[in-house]
Design a protein with these regions (language model features):
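Short, hydrophobic alpha-helix immediately C-terminal to the catalytic nucleophile
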Residues: 86, 90, 127, 161-165
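Alpha/beta-hydrolase-fold enzymes
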Residues: 139-140, 144-222
Length: 222
């Protein structure tokens, strides 16, 4: 599987990292996608933990590419309800793509179903998700998934990179179960996790650190 790096291009008026990070605060324009033919799914991790990831698959009446399922992942502290996850869902659904809004392990409504939490190196969770999607049958899924493509924003992009690095040598499932994984897209994700930690602890980023801590504390209190 080849890798292509596409340079990030800023768009007015959101220039610089701070304005880009705060865009969803300034502009509450994320769409309501709850009525877009939703079908909830539950994905058992099958790793002895009993954990279950959850998601919502939105299937257009006329699929542009039958059998193809896009999957949208969220960042740290997010869920299937995150603004950018909903933007991506609405955009591709309107183009005729079936798309799944995913709750990573312990996120969103998967919290009471999980003992563990997602992190940047949990690529095995995506491999389990792919294997499940590509072998599941209705009514567990709304249609037979033959191909899947993952789009990961922020931390879920890191998880995607971790998964793709392992996919050729995994012992989680048979290689044939993963033939339908056609690729993935990581968007603005931390590749060097140590550098990302140092950056978020810098003086100018303390509001973000405070926000992230407020998101992570309930996970460990649960």
């Amino acid at each position: 599987m080849s890798v292509q790096i596409i340079p990030f291009q800023q768009q007015l008026p959101f220039l610089g990292s701070h304005l880009q990070s705060m865009r969803i605060v300034f502009r509450r324009d994320h769409p309501d996608v709850s009525a877009l033919n939703p079908a909830p799914i539950q994905v058992p991790m099958n790793d002895g933990s009993g954990d279950v990831m959850t998601g919502i698959i939105h299937t257009p009446a006329e699929q542009r590419f039958p059998g193809l399922l896009l999957v949208a992942g969220h960042g740290f502290g997010g869920s299937a309800q995150s603004a950018y996850t909903r933007w991506v869902t609405k955009f591709f659904y309107d183009l005729g793509f079936a798309i799944c809004r995913l709750n990573l392990r312990g996120a969103g409504n998967s919290r009471p179903l999980c003992r563990n939490n997602y992190h940047g190196a949990c690529g095995d969770d995506l491999i389990r998700l792919w294997a499940w999607l590509l072998t599941a049958k209705p009514p567990a899924v709304p249609f037979r998934v033959e191909r899947t493509y993952f789009m990961g924003a922020s931390l879920s992009g890191s998880i995607l990179a971790n998964a793709l690095a392992k996919i050729d040598n995994t012992n989680i499932c048979a290689p044939s179960d993963l033939k339908g994984v056609i690729g993935g897209l990581g968007i603005c994700f931390p590749f060097d996790m140590a550098a990302a930690v140092r950056k978020i602890h810098s003086v100018t980023n303390w509001p973000y650190l405070k926000y992230f801590l407020s998101k992570i504390k309930p996970l460990f209190a649960a």
